[in-house]
Regions:
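Short, acidic/charged, Gly/Pro-enriched secondary-structure junctions
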Residues: 8, 76-148, 152
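Acidic/glycine-rich C-terminal interaction modules and beta/coil loop segments
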Residues: 135-141, 146, 156-171
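N-terminal disorder-to-order initiation segments that are Gly/Lys/Arg-biased
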Residues: 1-77, 158, 164-171
Length: 171
């Protein structure tokens, strides 16, 4: 598939009864395509213009997932160990970057031209405070990365004859 030169990180949500909520498992994928647009709509009930961004992300079957295997969302939810698995479903988070462990976030070094957090010179106090803790959460990811979307829909195009891939729409 042409123009698949982006690195993304997919964060799969999984209910953890011991934690009392979702745990977010990351998968870094090299060789994806990210296309984003900004749009506005007029909504009188919300006081006028409402801005939203929309992203279309394509992940070719041959993209590098770091050795992890794709599985359907039901199998992912029922698996005892998801360390070698990844999936795509509504509500997951996708970031246009190779997201480091949260403990390394403040000191991570980003190569020239690589997608990096909102503040490339170093984290300001607000961003640094927003990403403290042991685990990434959607709020922390959205505070740290400009290109961060919530998955709204997934189309499985793996049976396409010319370019088998998954297509994600998100906002």
């Amino acid at each position: 598939m042409k123009l698949c030169n982006d690195v993304i990180t997919v964060f799969n949500a999984r209910v953890d009864p011991d934690e009392g909520g979702n745990v977010w498992a990351p998968t870094v994928i090299a060789g994806a395509s990210w296309y984003a647009t900004d749009a506005s709509t007029v909504d009188a009930s919300k006081g006028g213009l409402v801005a939203a961004n929309k992203a279309t992300i394509r992940i070719p079957v041959e993209a590098d997932t770091g050795g992890k295997q794709y599985t359907d969302p039901v199998s992912y939810a029922n698996a005892e160990d998801v360390s070698g698995l990844w999936t795509l479903k509504g509500g997951d988070i996708v970031v246009r970057a190779a997201v480091p462990e949260i403990s390394d976030f403040g000191t991570a070094v980003f190569a020239e031209g690589e997608n990096h957090p909102v503040n490339s010179e170093g984290l300001d106090g607000v961003t640094r405070a927003a990403v403290t803790g042991a685990e990434w959460t959607p709020a922390k990811l959205k505070a740290a990365y400009a290109d961060c979307v919530t998955v709204l829909g997934v189309t499985d195009n793996r049976r396409a004859p010319n370019a088998p891939h998954w297509r994600i729409t998100g906002t």
